[in-house]
Amino acid sequence: MLEFIDSQLSSWPLARANYQALGKTERRSFEIGDLRVGVQFNPARIVSTGARIDAVSLAARPCFLCSENRPPEQTPVDIVEGWQLLLNPYPIFPTHFTIASSVHRPQEGFPLDMVEMAEKLPGMTVFFNGRHAGASCPDHLHCQAVMTHELPLMCLIEERHKLLSSETSGMRVATAVDLGLDSPVGFVSVIVTPDMDGMRQLARIEETIGKKYIEEGLVNIFVWKDSVGILRIVGVPRKAHRPSSYGTGIGQYLVSPGSIDMAGVIITPRRDDFESLTIDDIRRIYSEVGI
């Protein structure tokens, strides 16, 4: 994958400039309960954070994930049947991919192909924004992938939700409460054992995470293989797409939480928001959009 990234950056000036800008990215940190939350100042992400996602706006613009509308420099890699891996030209982290469906179809359901993607991307977490949970392109099915160590919530869950030696088969499920965590983000953590029983139980994953939230597009889903090769799936159910404070007016913040924000890295494209966000503001944002 490093060769793919290098090749894209050498031939694509826009992406190269945005990845180089990451080296100057500013960040603040807050300890909120057991979760260390980062706030990143990233002006390039205004494309996503400020995206208009109403039906009229979507219909009025060409879909930027369809192959015919992509920049000519954006070269796809067929990662899993029916899916193409693309370098994200507006990155949050130094390794940041978009994985788009080869066919234009809505951002719906739980794409179980994410499990195979995670197998193909060791060290990375594949994540999915529900259409009402941070998706800036809800008319075209897609996932994204970043390095797992960049996501505080995933690191915390790996540390606290472990597969016991006595638990040898199937699926193990825990919430923040079950794990004794003081987390501003509610979640359902699933460990899938690498055997037939575990694979069979994957068929019930929607019920485990919350079928209602998946059907309503109010969920963020994360899939990865941990450091010992165990498959992990985390669902973060949502009750809102954006907090009441979303906007550009006085006392408002241009913060539109997607998976990365819910995983503990809040993206702020405006400097004023980056500098003025407080721990109470962050708690409020999480409480208004999460469960």
Predicted regions and their residues:
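Helix-hairpin-helix/helix-loop-helix acidic hairpins
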Residues: 108-109, 118-121
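Active-site microenvironments that recognize anionic phosphate/pyrophosphate groups
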Residues: 1-113, 128-131, 148-291
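Active-site beta-strand/loop microenvironment that shapes enzyme catalytic pockets
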Residues: 120-154
